[in-house]
Structure formats: C-alpha cells, structure tokens
C-alpha cells in the first residue's frame, strides 16, 4: 500500500490473482441505430413512438450493467403548443415500458426534454437530444425507441420530417 510503480510503455502486466479496486465505468459495447428519415405526428398528450421508425437494439452482457441511450431527433410544435420526449423500452420476452424517464421520475408529463411555442408565432422546430441511463437488469435483447407527445395546447406536434434524420446510439456501461 502506498507504493508507486512505473510501467514502461509497451510493457505487459500479468496478474496471477484477482485485480480489485479499479471500479466500473468501462464501455462494454457500443450500438448505433440505422438513421431514419420520416415524420410522425400526434395531437395527443399520450406518448407515441416517433422518429420515422428508428429503433436501437442492444443485448447486455451482464444484468448488473447500465445502458446509456441517446436519440437525436427533430421536433416541431404548431404555435401555442408544446412537445416533450421520452423513450420506450421493450425487453425481449418481457415487458414493454412506454416512457422510461417518466416511469423512473414519477412524472406523468415531463419526459426527458422538449419545448413549447408561443401564441401567434408559427411552427417552432428544434433538434432535441434524449439521454437516459437505464438499469434494465437483464441479459435479454432490449429495443429502445424515441417517443413524444403534446405537452400543452390543442394542435399538432411532430417528431422528424421528410428532410431530417433521426439518429441514436447505446453504450453498455460495466458497473
């Protein structure tokens, strides 16, 4: 304890025991979704899957690992309307959860981000990044999809359009 060892570049270290105390945080795998182009619209305050059909599937190597999910999609809200985003999680052979951010936070209408447009201001557009660290406790394949809903107002909100790409990726993080 307290000793310092200098290891030259290119050296190989062989351990005959158990290496401990190094902590987690290593990226076990990276998965990118195939970017999609497409528009989904809704007038509902209930979450719907959007993003032009984009989905992100990852199979964790350990049930104790966490998954960092990120989606980047264009949102639009007609004047005097708001839009918020969340993520759907579907575990192969298990449950599908709409709005995993809402489910964890206990909020029914906040989601993982969004924006609102002012009255008499036309349609507002914004590229919104969704980030969530999930603890799915499984080694089954998990499919994540971006979701969105109208936050306030009575008009139409959109995710994606015919000229913008929705993209996403996931990182499995060892704990």
Where do the protein language model's features map onto the residues?
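Terminal beta-strand-rich extracellular "head" domains
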Residues: 42-43, 59-141, 145-175
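Intrinsically disordered, low-complexity, compositionally biased regions/tails
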Residues: 6, 14, 21, 25-27, ...
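Solvent-exposed, conformationally flexible loop/turn segments
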Residues: 39-51
């Amino acid at each position: 304890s307290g000793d310092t060892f200098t290891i030259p570049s290119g050296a190989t270290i062989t351990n005959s025991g158990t290496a401990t105390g190094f902590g987690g945080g290593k990226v076990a795998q990276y998965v990118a979704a195939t970017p999609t182009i497409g528009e989904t619209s809704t007038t509902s305050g209930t979450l719907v899957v959007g993003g032009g059909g984009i989905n992100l599937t990852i199979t964790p190597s350990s049930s104790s690992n966490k998954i960092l999910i990120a989606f980047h999609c264009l949102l639009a809200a007609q004047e005097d309307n708001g839009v918020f985003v969340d993520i759907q999680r579907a575990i192969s052979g298990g449950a599908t959860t709409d709005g995993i951010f809402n489910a964890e936070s206990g909020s029914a209408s906040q989601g993982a981000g969004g924006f609102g447009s002012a009255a008499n201001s036309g349609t507002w557009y914004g590229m919104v990044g969704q980030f969530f660290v999930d603890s799915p406790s499984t080694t089954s394949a998990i499919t994540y999809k971006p979701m969105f809903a109208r936050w306030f107002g009575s008009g139409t909100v959109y995710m994606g359009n015919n000229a913008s790409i929705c993209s996403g990726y996931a990182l499995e993080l060892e704990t």
